[in-house]
Amino acid sequence: AQSFVRL
């Protein structure tokens, strides 16, 4: 699984 944060 990949996690990311949109800035």
Swiss-Prot record:
Physiological role: FMRFamides and FMRFamide-like peptides are neuropeptides.
Principal subcellular localization: secreted
Leucine amide, modified sites: 7
Native source species: Tyrannophasma gladiator (Gladiator)
Record-annotated membrane-spanning stretches: none
Protein name: Extended FMRFamide-1
Cell compartment(s), UniProt: Secreted
Family statement: Belongs to the FARP (FMRF amide related peptide) family.
